[in-house]
Amino acid sequence: MTSTSPKSRKPSTKTTKSKSKSKSKSKAAKAAAAGASPALARTPPQFRNRVIDKKALKQLVAWAYKTHGTAVTASMADNLKDLGFRYATQAAVSISVEDLKVPEAKQDLLGQAEAQITATEECYRLGEITEVERHTKVIDTWTETNERLVDAVKKNFNQNDPLNSVWMMANSGARGNMSQVRQLVGMRGLMANPQGEIIDLPIRTNFREGLTVTEYVISSYGARKGLVDTALRTADSGYLTRRLVDVAQDVIVREDDCGTTRGIIVKAEDGGFGSRLVGRLTAEQVVNVDGEILAERNTEIDPPLSKRFEKAAITEVMVRSPLTCEANRSVCRKCYGWALAHNELADLGEAVGIIAAQSIGEPGTQLTMRTFHTGGVSTAETGVVRSTVAGTVEFGPKARVRGYRTPHGLEAQQSEVDFTLTVKPSGKGRAQRIDITTGSLLFVSDGQEIEADVTVVQIAAVAVKKSVEKATKDVICDLAGQVRYEQVIQPREVKDRQGNITLKAQRLGRLWVLAGDVYNLPPNAEPVVQGNVKVERGQVLAEASQASEFGGEVRLRDSIGDSREVQIVTTSMTMKDFKLLGESTHSGELWHLEAKDGTRYRLNTIPGSKIGNGEVVAELADDRFRTQTGGLVRFAPGLAIKKARSAKNGFEVNKGGTLLWIPQETHEINKDISLLMIEDGQWIEAGTEVVKDIFSQTAGIVTVTQKNDILREIIVRSGSFHLCTETKALERFTGDGQIVNPGETIAKGINSEAMVFVQTVDTPEGTGLLLRPMEEYTIPNEAQLPELTHVKQPKGPHLGIKATQRLAFKDGELIKSVEGVELLKTQLILETFDTTPQMTVDVEAVRDKRAKTIERLRLVILESILVRRDTISDSSHGSTHTELQIEDGQSVKASDVVATTQILCKQEGIAQLPVVQEGDPVRRLIVERDEDTITVTTNGSPLVEVGQRLVDGDSLAKDEPSSCCGEVEEVDGKAITLRLGRPYMVSPDSVLHVRDGDLVQRGDGLALLVFERQKTGDIVQGLPRIEELLEARRPRESAVLCKKPGTVEIKQGEDDESITVTVIEADDAIGEYPILLGRNVMVSNGQQVHAGELLTDGPINPHELLDCFFEDLRGRKPLMDAAQEAIAKLQHRLVTEVQNVYKSQGVSIDDKHIEVIVRQMTSKVRIEDAGDTTLLPGELIELRQVEDTNQAMAITGGAPSEFTPVLLGITKASLNTDSFISAASFQETTRVLTEAAIEGKSDWLRGLKENVIIGRLIPAGTGFSGFQEELRAEAGPHPDILAEDPAGYRRMQNLRPDYTVDMPAAPAASSTAVLADPSDADLEATRSRHGIDPAASNFAAFVRPTGENELEEEQLPDPSALEGLQQEGLLTEE
C-alpha cells in the first residue's frame, strides 16, 4: 500500500460530510469519495486483489489513518463494517457439527505413532534404554504426531473445503485459533497432571469424535489448572502493575533535547530489526556500505526509512534511547522518540513512565504462570542432515568430539568445536561437505563406511549451551526375583555429610532381576531350609516363635471375632479387706470401696479401665475436713508439707499438725456499682441482699472492691466488732491482722475467751477491731491404710498401694469462695516399681472365692501377645500356619514360647537364601520354580556359556536367536536352560536401592535415575519470571560468572568429584573458581572467556553480573565511563530478557517501555569513598548527581568521590525515590515518613503521585505548561526575552543556587551543567538585540556573593539604575 507524505495528514474540511449514500460503489471508490483529500485526488486508487484477513485489515486501517487522518479512516471503517455485515448476512456463516471434518490421514498418523511407541517399549523391555529415555521418547513421539496432525487438518480444509465456517473463522482471525481447531478435529494431545508432569497417555480423540471416560478425567486436570491459574494471575498481574507505576510515575517528558551523543545499538541479529527501529531517532549518521548517507543524526525513523535500512543491508544502527538520555530526572523528546498513540514525537509533559508501566503490566494476565516441560528438544530447533553419497566419513584434524547419549537413548558423539565433516564417495562424484557447529550430534564415527540417505548429523540450531536441571525418576520392578548387577555398572558407596551411605552407579549398565518366588519372612523368623535345596509344596521354609517376656498365668480371651490375643497375668493384687460397691446415678456409675470399719473410699477409675504409675486409685470420702465457706488458711507450727510434682494435685503432708481456718465469704461479681445494695464497712446479717439477687450466707462486716465503677468483689468477714480509739492497738492489727491466743488482752476493755484472728477495719460508725473466730483441724502424721494382699512374681514387676494425705492449699492462701472447700484429701496411690514407664495396670472386679455375693477390687499387670493368624497363600508371604503352645490357666516362665508360626512353601522348586551381612537377619528367601526357567534345544552347537545373560535376539547358536531374556543356568549338549529375567538400564550417577544378590518383590524400587533435562526457560515462566527480572531477585543457586577475561583451564580435584575452573587473565593473574558438586561446567579447556560469561549452568545473579562488568572495566577506563558502560551492558541484558519472556508468549511490547523502567532501576550508585564532597559513604545517589559533584571537584581541585553502580528492584527503587510522599504512599509508610522527618527532607513535588496526594495540578499533560510557567516565573522578569533567547533562558535556569539575585533564583531543573557567568560580550549582544538600555538591564542585578553570602557595600547595584528599571516597568516595588 502506498503512503503519501505526512503533510497530507489533515483531511480537507468537507471530508466528513461527503459520505457516499450509494451502496453499489466499490470499496476503493467509497474510500476515495469519503476522503477526497488532495493526495487521493492526485493518485489513482490502488487495486489490491487479495484476501483481507484480520492482519491485512489492521494494515489497511493504519495506512488510511497515516495517510488521510482520522475522519477519513472513521468513514472508511464504517463502510467496511457495512460491507462486512451485508455479506455475512447473505453468506450466513454459522457453525454446526457437520462443519467439523476429521482428516482421513488421522488414523495412519496414529498407527505410525503406536508402532513407534511399541518399538520404544520393546527397547525398554530389553534394557536398551532407561525409564527416563522411554518416557521422553513417548512424549516426543506424541508431540510430533500432534504437529503432523495439525498440518493434515490445515491441508484437508484448504484442499477439500476452503469455505468451511470453522476454517474461515480461525483463518481470518475473526474467532478462534489453530490450537482450538486442532482439538475440535485433530486430537487433544498430551495433558499434564496437577504436579505439572506430562502424562504419557495422550488424548487421541477430538471433541467431534468424543472423549472416553479416562480421557475426560485426564482432560479435566488441565481445565481445573487453567481456571485456578487465571484467578491467581489476575492478582499477581495487578500488583506488578502497581509497583511499575510507582517506580516510573515521575518520568515525564520535560525537555525537547538533552543533547546527548550516546545511544544504544540495535542489531539485526537480535531479530525484529525493522520494527524495533520505527519510532526512534538516530544517534549518529547512518551510512551504507558505499559511503552514502542514509540518515543524518536525530532523524526520525519511520517505516519507509527502516525498510531502506534493511534493503541497504545495514546490520546495526545506533539510536537514541531513554536509557542514555541525559535529561535530569526525566526523559527528553528526542531520546524517547515517537509516542506510539499517534506515531509522532512525544509531546512535552507526556507521562511516559505511567504509559510504560501499564504497557508492561497489562499483558500480565495473558502470560501463563508456567508452561509444561515437554521432554526432549522439539524438532523445530534442530536440522537433521542426511548423506547424499555413499562413502567414507572423515572428521578432519580440527574435530573434537565426545561420547554422548541422546535423550532417546541413542549412542552418538557431540562436537566440542566447529569443524567441517566430509563424506568421500566410494566411486566417482563430488564429496559431501557438512559444516558442524558446536553441540551438534554426530551419528557416524571417523572412518566409517556409510550408505546414501543415512542420518549423519543433527545440527544444533545455535551454538548455545542450554542450562539443564537435575531431575529424578524411580525404576520400579515388574517381577519378583533376585537382583544381579552387570560388571559395567561399577557401583560405589558415597557418604554424605550426615554419614548416610548411598550406592551409586558409575557407568551406564543393566540391573537384572532373575525370576523366582520370593517369600517375605516375619520378624524373628529363622529359615529352616538350607540354600540350593529342593523343597516340596507345603514344606516348612521358616519358623517364627513368640515368647513371654515376664511369664505368669495364661489367660486366653474368648474368641472375640477373630482376635488372637494371649494375655499373661504377670502380677496381681486383690484388695481383700474392701468390698466393691457400685451404684448407678444419673451421671453414670459410681464405685466405692468399703472397709470393715465402714470407712468408704470413692473409686477414681471404673473396673475394666487402665491406670498408670502414681495415679490415684481411690479417695477417702471424709467430710471432717470440709468447710462451710471460703477463707484463709494458716498452718500452726509443726505442720510440714512437701510440694507435689504439680500443684494441681495438692501438697503431700510430711508431718501432721494443726491447720487453722479463718472463714470469710467472698462473692466475685462483675456488675455495675449502681446495683450495690449495702455500703463498704457496713455490718450485715445473714441472708442480707448485698447486690441485686445475691444474698450473704453469714453475718459480718462487708468490704467492697470496685474499679472504674464496676464491682469486682464483696467480702463478708464474720466475727464481733469493737469500736476502738487506742492508736497502738489499731496499728498493731492493721494490714493482714494477727492471731491472738485465749485470755490475751487485745485492747483496753477487749479480751477473748477463744483463739481469734484480729484485724483493724473501717466502718461508717468509725474505726475498730474485728475479732474473727477460727476453726482448728487436726491432721494425723500418716494416713491409715487397710490390709492389702500381694501376689509377686519372681521376675515380674512389683505392684503396691500407698496412702497419702494431700492438702489442697499452702500456708497463708486465701480461698475466694461462697461454698465450702475440702482442705485435706486422703488418697490411695498406685506404685509399680518397674523400669518401663509406659507399664499400665488393669483394674478388675472379681467375685470373692468364699462369699460369692461380694465383689473385690483386683489390680493386675498383663502382658499381651498378639498371635499371627493363619493366612492362605498370598502373593508375597506364602501360606502361614500358627500354633499355640499353651493352654488357658497354665503357668509359664519368662521367655517360654507361647506360639510358633510356620511359613509353608506354595510351589515346589529350589530354595535359595540371599546374601546377608554377618549378624543381619534373613528377611526374604526365594524358591526357583519350574516356570521360572525355560529349556531350549538348538540345532547347531550352542555359542553361550553358563552365567551369560541374554536378551531377545541374542544368538544361542548360529542363526538361532533367543526368544526371551534371562541367564544361562546350564548347557547340556544342545539343550540350554535359561532362568527367565528382566533387564533394567540404569544411567551413570543413579542411586541404587538394592545390592547385588538382594531379593525383590514386584513393585519394589530398584533405583532412582538421576537425569538432566533441558530447562527450555519454561521452569520459571511468564509472570514469575518477569517479576524475578524486574525485582532483580538473587537466585538461590546462581551460575558462577567469570570476573575478568582470559583463557580457561579445567582442573579435576583429587577425589574426581570437585572441579576447579582457573582463568588465566591478561596480566597473567590467575582467577580460581571452585565448582560445586552437581554443577555443569559450560566452558572447555583453552576457551577464551569474557567478564560476566557463564562458567557453569544456572540462573544468573544480575547484581553479580553488574559487579563483574564494572570491576573489569574499572581497571581500563575512568570511573565514570566504566560505570556507564557496565550499566549499559546490564540494561541491554535486562531489556532483552524481559522481551524474551513476552515474545515467547506472543505478546509484543515496544522496547522503549521496558527501557524507561530499567532506567529507573539502574539510575543510582552507592558512594564508597566521599572524597572532598559532601556525600556520605553508603549513600544511594543518582549517577548524574555524582557526575556533577565530581565535575565541580575537578574545577576546585578537590578529591572526587568513589562509587559503584547498583541495581535496584522496582520495589526498592520506589522506596528510594527523592519524593518521600510517593515512597510513603507505596509501602512501609511509617518507616519512610520517620526517616524523612529525621533527615529533614524536602519534597519538590516533581512526580504525579506527590501532586495528586497534596491536591495540586499534576505536572503532566495540560498541567505541564503551568509547571513550566512556574519555572519561568522563577527564572526572571523577562519571559519574552527568555523565550526568544534560549541560551539566555538556559543560563538563567542553570544559575547555581549560591548566586544571589534580586529575584527568586531558578532551581536547577532541566540540566545540572554548571555554566560560567554571562560574559560582557554576551550581555551586550542580548541588550542590543532587544534594544534595552544598559543602565536598565536586568542582568546588572547579578552579582557574586562572598563567603559569608552577604553582599559587600560596593557590590550593591546603583540606586539610580534600580530607579530606572522601575520607571521602565521592568522591576516592581517588591
From Swiss-Prot:
Domain of life: Bacteria
Region ranges (Disordered): 1-47, 1344-1374
Cofactor: Zn(2+)
Enzyme class: transferase
GO cellular component, one term: DNA-directed RNA polymerase complex
CDD domains (UniProt xref): RNAP_beta'_C
The enzyme's E.C. designation: 2.7.7.6
Biased amino acid composition, Low complexity: 29-39, 1362-1374
Alphabetic keyword roster: DNA-directed RNA polymerase, Metal-binding, Nucleotidyltransferase, Transcription, Transferase, Zinc
Cofactor note: Binds 1 Zn(2+) ion per subunit.
Catalytic reaction equation(s): RNA(n) + a ribonucleoside 5'-triphosphate = RNA(n+1) + diphosphate
Record's keyword annotation contains Transcription: yes
SUPFAM superfamilies, per database record: beta and beta-prime subunits of DNA dependent RNA-polymerase
InterPro entries to which the protein is assigned, alphabetical: DNA-dir_RpoC2_beta_pp, DNA-dir_RpoC_beta_prime, RNA_pol_Rpb1_3, RNA_pol_Rpb1_3_sf, RNA_pol_Rpb1_4, RNA_pol_Rpb1_5, Rpb1_funnel_sf
Gene Ontology biological process terms in this record: DNA-templated transcription
Gene3D superfamilies: 1.10.132.30, 1.10.150.390, 1.10.1790.20, 2.40.50.100, RNA polymerase Rpb1, domain 3
Molecular function GO labels: DNA binding; DNA-directed RNA polymerase activity; zinc ion binding
Residues involved in Zn(2+) binding: 258, 325, 332, 335
Basic residues composition bias: residue spans: 7-28
NCBIfam families found in the cross-reference section: PRK02597.1, rpoC2_cyan
Function: DNA-dependent RNA polymerase catalyzes the transcription of DNA into RNA using the four ribonucleoside triphosphates as substrates.
Family: Belongs to the RNA polymerase beta' chain family. RpoC2 subfamily.
Known partners and oligomeric status: In cyanobacteria the RNAP catalytic core is composed of 2 alpha, 1 beta, 1 beta', 1 gamma and 1 omega subunit. When a sigma factor is associated with the core the holoenzyme is formed, which can initiate transcription.
Protein name: DNA-directed RNA polymerase subunit beta'
